[in-house]
């Protein structure tokens, strides 16, 4: 397939005429005569002085630093001079507090420079990590082809990583693999689309769609929050029988997190996974609610309705969402809607209990505003793992329990016939959770979210926006101390 040049990338993404190069003459390093001739030929053929070009431009008026490979220059390979150029650009972006767009197209380490070139990936990765630790967005667009040490370093450290359709993306290039092992690498593995399916990257985006996607992402990542919408008048909470709420939460047509994003959010950018395999039961996104920027982490309802079961991969994705929110200093919105944990040998061997524990510990101590929402079923450890936020909202028919009511009945009565009775006794419905201080606000349903999905999504969006707006005003140490004290006192006698 044809390759996207750095010129084509800049023209497609940046505001017209906004690019300013940061590059000076490449660092002079001692080279053999044969390599010097290769460099001279590459410069003559491409008009570029190295395999990497850096600078800054604007995306819809926002300053953005840019680092991009030119594959036609020695396969976009990275030697000492190219690595020094990349590192200097990343350090400058950090110093000037700019978001960074990196677009590799490279075979990896420049073999003509050997081990010294190989070690350059360390300083590039270090510079990018420091940029990330400065809470600055790092966005990656992988172009065809990206392999080797480039993919295994600065190509895989993005907060958001997307790739060109059809691009060859992988660690070891297929030609090298075949020469080393005598067999061709399995087809269809090292493709952008396959990596997207497996959660290694966040999306596959054509070049002509990259600019609007970056605009949406930057709107969430760096633009200021908008003024808060007019406050809603609190509605009285009807006395709904517990089992009616359980039944309502299981309706096949009940809106889930995707409907909330579609109807209640703007500037949505869906993220894919954890770099360890996609978890279809968990959704991760950037979005704004009522003009308030957030990271959204939601448990997805199963296709055809009902709750999904949550396994260790979904919880790893939840942890990625928590880390992303903290690293970018964005409020985190968590949507709970799960029938319970996945119960299988694979889940046990995948560390389900440990992932629940890590989610729980990381969320309750997270250094950013957090809002949890009991949207429907809140059953078991996966629900608990996403609950301990600064503020907890519940849909009228949302509920929270250590097990599905049928499971609790099986333990206590050795049958499932007492599920409704036990659900009421355990205080799992939203009204009971409000009384016990577990929930702060109940979002009404008239009479059921499934009967008014768009109106409900807008109502919930407004409630989220109000909570996020209020939490952002509280100093981080005070917010964290209040959160810890809140969960320290759950279940204790009130003064």
UniProtKB/Swiss-Prot annotation:
Residues 242-470 form the CoA carboxyltransferase C-terminal domain. Coiled coil: none annotated. GO terms for molecular function: acetyl-CoA carboxylase activity; transferase activity. One of its GO terms (biological process) is mycolic acid biosynthetic process. It comes from the Bacteria. Pfam families: Carboxyl_trans. Its EC number is 2.1.3.-. Gene3D superfamilies: 2-enoyl-CoA Hydratase, Chain A, domain 1. The keyword Transferase applies. Keywords: Transferase. Disruption phenotype: Not essential for growth. Residues 1-236 form the CoA carboxyltransferase N-terminal domain. Induction: Does not show significant changes in expression throughout M.tuberculosis growth phases. GO terms for cellular component: acetyl-CoA carboxylase complex; plasma membrane. Component of a biotin-dependent acyl-CoA carboxylase complex. This subunit transfers the CO2 from carboxybiotin to the CoA ester substrate. The biotin-dependent acyl-CoA carboxylase complex is composed of an AccA protein, which contains the biotin carboxylase (BC) and biotin carboxyl carrier protein (BCCP) domains, and an AccD protein, which contains the carboxyl transferase (CT) domain. Belongs to the AccD/PCCB family. Was identified as a high-confidence drug target. This is Probable biotin-dependent acyl-coenzyme A carboxylase beta3 subunit. It comes from Mycobacterium tuberculosis (strain ATCC 25618 / H37Rv).
